[in-house]
From Swiss-Prot:
Catalytic residues, chain numbering: 124 (proton acceptor), 382 (s-methylcysteine intermediate)
Gene field: rlmN
Keyword Cytoplasm: yes
Protein name: Dual-specificity RNA methyltransferase RlmN
Key words, A-Z: 4Fe-4S, Cytoplasm, Disulfide bond, Iron, Iron-sulfur, Metal-binding, Methyltransferase, rRNA processing, S-adenosyl-L-methionine, Transferase, tRNA processing
MF terms (GO), sorted A to Z: 4 iron, 4 sulfur cluster binding; metal ion binding; rRNA (adenine(2503)-C2-)-methyltransferase activity; rRNA binding; tRNA (adenine(37)-C2)-methyltransferase activity; tRNA binding
Chief location of this protein within or outside the cell: cytoplasm
Organism taxonomic ancestry: Bacteria, Pseudomonadati, Pseudomonadota, Alphaproteobacteria, Hyphomicrobiales
Catalytic activity field: adenosine(2503) in 23S rRNA + 2 reduced [2Fe-2S]-[ferredoxin] + 2 S-adenosyl-L-methionine = 2-methyladenosine(2503) in 23S rRNA + 5'-deoxyadenosine + L-methionine + 2 oxidized [2Fe-2S]-[ferredoxin] + S-adenosyl-L-homocysteine; adenosine(37) in tRNA + 2 reduced [2Fe-2S]-[ferredoxin] + 2 S-adenosyl-L-methionine = 2-methyladenosine(37) in tRNA + 5'-deoxyadenosine + L-methionine + 2 oxidized [2Fe-2S]-[ferredoxin] + S-adenosyl-L-homocysteine
Binding residues annotated for S-adenosyl-L-methionine, in chain numbering: 208-209, 240, 262-264, 339
Alphabetized PROSITE patterns for the sequence: RADICAL_SAM
Cofactors: [4Fe-4S] cluster
Length: 411
């Protein structure tokens, strides 16, 4: 039996989803730590002796059962449910658009309600079904400040960070839509693993730089990996960064998930152009942080992502430099055929050259899979994500970026 189960007929039927709470001032319980959830309940009058029990109940209903309506919590008293409805929400974001690629990749454009005096924002989340696993690509920011020259998201101005709730809500909504919670069914025609979890892996590789939103990402990933809730193994969660060196150290110490580096060049002069954060954290500093990442072994390697750009970084000299750069680091090198997007000046390397590059690296003892492009037809592939939320004024954006730089010790 194939590890991929294709449901028929193939015509997509949107399944009912919970309606978002529009302009709701009520805080969400999603994304709160147990301690924060307990404090929120106490503030609304829950007796001290009941708080721990109530938190356990809510945790199970939200993250194990996947409910988005307090009335579905069958073992919670009616009075308690009424209090929860009056003061809190566990609603999902609004699905603005759902697209399904010919290869089964699924992309959601999600809208989150305003924060404070802000406006609603939109982000993209992508589900990639493969044999034996299903990977969810999650966004951490609305837009991005890093302006990597080959990345479509980099052309979208940074609007704001996502909260821990908004990061986790992408995972909860995907599991809703894919029938990955009890008593849920996926739309007919959905391609997904035939056995086990529909969302087995989570990668912080969507819109934004996760390590410029460290605290929210940390909270979300620790909740996602909590053994009494969503229970994703930390070895099945990968955080991808362009190289925010100070926070790479913190990621290893405080989160402990798998690490991926958006590398793309082996010389500082070229990487300065492709990945401008390299001007602040050059390759030597980045490699030092990688070598210090806790728990590295042949079974726990850092993934280095390398987009193949024709005539830019795809020579055998580049391959030789890559081998030298990664010496002593347990590594896997993902070679990514460049995914075109409207307005780009880059081209994908010829397939023959990509294979030569991969063979050269493989001969040196490094795993060097060529990533199969997924979801290109719906702009869901690596480097293609972008939403229409570009509403932060220039002065606000520059102030926000200056704050982030100050918080990371930049000049």
């Amino acid at each position: 039996m194939s590890a991929i189960d294709v449901m028929t007929p193939s015509k997509l039927k949107p399944m009912p989803v919970s309606q978002p709470v529009e302009l709701s001032p009520k805080p969400s319980l999603i994304g709160l730590t147990r301690e924060e959830m307990g404090a929120a309940l106490k503030e609304k009058g829950v007796a001290d002796k009941q708080v721990k029990m109530r938190v356990s109940q809510l945790w199970n209903w939200i993250y194990v059962r996947g409910v988005s309506d307090f009335d579905a919590m069958a073992n919670v008293s009616k009075d308690m449910r009424e209090m929860l409805k009056a003061h809190f929400t566990i609603a999902r974001p609004e699905i603005v658009e759902e697209q399904v690629s010919n290869d089964g990749t699924r992309k959601w454009l999600l809208r989150f309600p305003p924060r404070g005096a802000g406006r609603p924002v939109e982000v993209e989340t992508v589900y990639i079904p493969e044999e034996g696993r299903g990977t969810l690509c999650v966004s951490s920011q609305v837009g991005c400040s890093l302006t990597c020259s080959f990345c479509h998201t980099g052309t979208q101005r940074l609007v704001r960070n996502l909260t821990a709730e908004e990061i986790l809500s992408q995972l909860l909504l995907a599991r809703d839509r894919l029938g990955d919670f009890p008593d849920r069914e996926a739309p007919q025609g959905t391609i997904m693993p035939a056995e086990g979890r529909k969302v087995s892996n989570m990668v912080m590789m969507g819109m934004g730089e996760p390590l410029y939103n460290f605290e929210s990402v940390k909270t979300a990933l620790l909740i996602a990996s909590d053994g009494d809730g969503l229970s994703l193994s930390k070895r099945r969660i990968t955080l991808s960064t362009s190289g925010v060196v100070p926070e790479i150290y913190r990621t290893g110490d405080e989160i402990g998930v798998m690490l991926a580096i958006s590398l793309h060049a082996v010389r500082d002069d070229l990487r300065d152009m492709l990945v401008p954060i390299n001007k602040k954290y050059p390759l030597k500093e980045l490699m030092d942080a990688c070598r210090a990442y806790p728990g590295l072994s042949n079974a726990r390697r850092i993934t280095f992502e390398y987009v193949m750009l024709k005539g830019v970084n795809d020579s055998l000299e580049d391959a030789k430099g890559l081998i030298q750069l990664l010496k002593g680091i347990p590594s896997k090198i993902n070679l990514i055929p460049f995914n075109p997007w409207p307005g780009t000046n880059y081209q994908c390397s010829d397939w023959e050259q990509i294979e030569k590059f991969a063979d050269f690296i493989n001969a040196a003892g490094y795993a060097s899979p060529i990533r199969t492009p997924r979801g290109r037809d719906i702009l869901a592939a690596c480097g293609q994500l972008k939403s229409d939320s570009e509403r932060m004024r220039k002065t606000e954006r520059l102030a926000f970026e200056a704050m982030m730089i100050a918080n990371h010790g930049e000049d």
